[in-house]
Amino acid sequence: MPEGDSVYRLARRLRPALVGHRLVHAELRVPALATLDLAGATVTEIVTHGKHQLTRVVRGDGEALTLHTHLKMTGSWTVVGAGKRLPSRLMDTVRVLLELDDGATAYGLDLPVVEVVPTAQEDDAVGHLGPDPLRADWDAAEAVRRLAAQPDRPVAAALLDQRNLAGLGNLWVNELCFLRGTSPWSPVGELDVPALVALARRCLRHSALVEGAYQVTTGDRRDGRSHWVSGRAGQACLRCGTPVRVVEEVPGDAERRRTWWCPHCQPGPGPEPGRTGPAPATQAWDRPLAAGGRAARLTPRSRTGRSRPGR
């Protein structure tokens, strides 16, 4: 499933094509909205909250509406220029069609979530979400409060819960646990939650905003080396050489996503009941992301407190 940084980047690409343009024809191909006519409305904003996209429009009579969509596992958006059409093989997957006054058309394909709400009532759609590190109204203290409210919950499951902190998906949760040097099954109450939240914000913003850094956590964009643990089951840990492990289910996660971790670099509870490792409090991952326009490598501190060089 696309994560918050993915949806943020998608919205950024869609804005030049849609914002400020009038809809000359619109189709919302879901039963509940089949009769809603948005023709004549002007697209005013495209914003995101976590993995949710909010496309705001104002109709000719001044009514402000928001098209709320979510990609989940199947959805995508594409824009074709004037005089061009979407390939016919894809037309059956169209859930949203927005024809613009310059002749371009935006298509939302295979979108599992399509709804329209009054803009003043957007909270009906996204009000349950936690703070989003990519939004201007980001509230770190509130994210910390929500996570800390369930001290016994495994950290990976807590981070995946969009009600705590919006935008983190499986890739970033796995990488954050590695970067903080903690087992994905460590209870939230045993961790430095403010430091975890600060790192999550820094990583998401770096990935979303820095050219060439999208979802690269190691600073190395080569295939198989862009992530510390995600997708690297059975391969040697890039830090210590221990084989990376994977399990199919995150405790408490209904979507049964995979969890990757290095047993040596991420001490603490394991996925098996009762299994534990060395206490995680002896390590911290805190090297800042590079400010330049390239991927940055985050590396851990050793138990002596000296930074290990990236390798």
Where are these regions (language model features)?
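Basic, nucleic-acid-binding surfaces and adjacent catalytic neighborhoods in DNA/RNA-processing proteins
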Residues: R22-D37, V47, R59, R85, ...
